[in-house]
Curated annotation (Swiss-Prot):
Prevents the cell division inhibition by proteins MinC and MinD at internal division sites while permitting inhibition at polar sites. This ensures cell division at the proper site by restricting the formation of a division septum at the midpoint of the long axis of the cell. The gene is minE. One of its GO terms (biological process) is cell division. Belongs to the MinE family. This is Cell division topological specificity factor. Keywords: Cell cycle, Cell division. It comes from Herpetosiphon aurantiacus (strain ATCC 23779 / DSM 785 / 114-95). It comes from the Bacteria. Transmembrane segments: none annotated. InterPro entries: MinE, MinE_sf. The keyword Lipid biosynthesis does not apply.
Amino acid sequence: MGLLDNLFGRKQQNSSSVAKERLLTVLVHDRVHLTPHDMEEMKREIIAVIERYVEVTNPEAIEVTLTRGEAADHLKADIPLGRSRQQ
């Protein structure tokens, strides 16, 4: 997979960049006062709302993350959705 990753521009992260990313995530969680339990509850609620409108194909693959931006913190939800056929 390393060759394919290099061909398609995917970069492997070294341990220091992974550690830095994890530390930033912890800092953002602390800054917005969300516990891991609160994040999981928010994730469940987001899924429930989205499922009212579209099919969520793989709930286990959903990722909800908080990131620190220059001007504001950001909540990102990566949710795989089913495709419907055009009629």
